[in-house]
C-alpha cells in the first residue's frame, strides 16, 4: 500500500498551506483540468477570416509637404578706405596750385574735361565689383566711393603728367595736349593702390588724335603694367620654343633621303651549275712531296709518343706487380724458416 499526498487548493487563502489528506492511490486516469488542458491537450487550429473590405490610403501630396526655406539676412558694412581720404587731400592741394597758376584756354579745358569724363567712366567700369544682394544704401555708398576714386585718380594723373613745366615751352611753362614735348621728362610714380589698366583702355577708345603726342606719355601704360612671373616665364621660354619649332619645320621641309637600289648579283656561272672549286696556291711537285713527307713524320711522331706512353705505363705496372710478388715470397720464406727452427 502506498500513500500519496493530494493537495486541496479549493477554498484556501493565500500564504496558507492546504491541509494534507492521506488516502490510498486510485487506479483511475487523471483528469485534465481547464488550466492544464492548454498545456497537455491538443490545440485546435484557429481560423482567421479573410479581409473582404478594401481600405483606401490617403497620402498627402508632394506640394503640401514643401516647406519654404527662409534665407538668412546678410548685413555687410562697407568701410571707407584710407586711400580715398589721402587722394582727396592731394586733389585739394593740386586745385589750389592750378588756381594760382591761372586759367587755361577754352580748347584745353574742353579737351581735359572730355578726357576726364572718359577716364572716369572707364575707371568706374573697371573698378565696379560684383553686385551685392543687400541694402540699396550699401550699393549707393560703394558706387560713390568708386566714382570718387576714379575722378581723383584721373585728375592727379593728368595734372601731373600732361601739364609738365619746362623752360622751352612758350605759354607760362605749361605744355598743351596737342603740341609735342621737346624734352620728355621722367614721369612720377602712380598713386598707390591703383593700376594703369584704365589708361591703356582709354588709349584704345579715344585714339591717337585726342591724346597727347609725346612718346613718354604714350608708353606709360605699357611700361608701368605689373608683369606676372608666369608671363615672364612664358616670354622667356617662347624664343626657345620658336627656335625648336622652326628647326622642326626645316626638318620636315627637307626631302627624305632616297635610297639607291642595289644592283643584282652578277654570277660568273650558271644558276644550274655550282660554284667553281677553290683555287689552291701553285706548288712544284718537289715542294708537294716535301710537305707530304713532313706531315707523315709528324703523324708518326705523334703515334710513337702514344705508343711509348702506353709501354711505359705497362712496364711500370709490371714492375710494381713484380716487386709485390717478391715481397710476398720473402715474407713466406721468413715465416717458414722460423717455424722449422
Swiss-Prot record:
Compositionally biased region (Low complexity): 234-245
Basic and acidic residues bias: start-end ranges: 75-101
Domain of life: Eukaryota
Region Disordered, annotated ranges: 75-115, 216-278
Short name of one Pfam family: POM121
Similarity comment: family membership: Belongs to the UPF0607 family.
Matches recorded under PANTHER family: POM121-LIKE (PTHR15566), UPF0607 PROTEIN ENSP00000332738-RELATED (PTHR15566:SF7)
The protein's name: Putative UPF0607 protein ENSP00000383783
